[in-house]
Amino acid sequence: MSRGIIVLDAGHGQFGNRYPLLENTFEGTQNFKLAMRLKAELEARGFAVLLTRNSIEDDPSLEERGKLAGDNHAALFLSIHSNAPGAASSPEAYHAVRGSEVYYSLADEPRNAEIARALNDAVVTTMNTTDRGIKTRSYPDQPGINYYGVLRHSAAYGCPTAFIIEHGFHTNPEDAAFLSNDECLQRLAVAEAEVIDKVL
């Protein structure tokens, strides 16, 4: 018997956001690879897992991604990403930024911050990267409404336990090297599955 449904959202599409320091490497592809590994680890622990991208070519809308969690009464929605900085003073400064951060839904779920912290701690430790903390973001004129579409739509369709993990910066040489390595992605999958196994 399933312990509950987890929805994994591999962010972007196959060729979304090229790694600037590596040839033929894209955030959307690496997100999908990590999601597939995490799916296997969660299923081994008794969870049922649904993917917003069932093939690497898929690129559903933000609403479709969040709606999948609500429609299936998911216990947890996890959107898998890596990060890139905004404007920087120099190329060196741009590539120097690194670290993990987790955004959690503003929906009325008291354990969201606790789960976000556990997920972020696992990523920071596994990647040996900077801890950029756990965060929320709302619209400036609409406090309490999630800024990020997948969190907003997952809450609107009935899944308040929702997170975005920014697994380091694919613009940083150390983080990018980790995220482009299949063995390292497997280590991340195990670490994140262990957290979900404990909190649900």
Describe each region flagged by the PLM.
Residues 112-142:
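Active-site-adjacent substrate-binding region
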Residues 48-50, 131-132, 162:
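Hydrophobic anchor at the start of a short beta-strand
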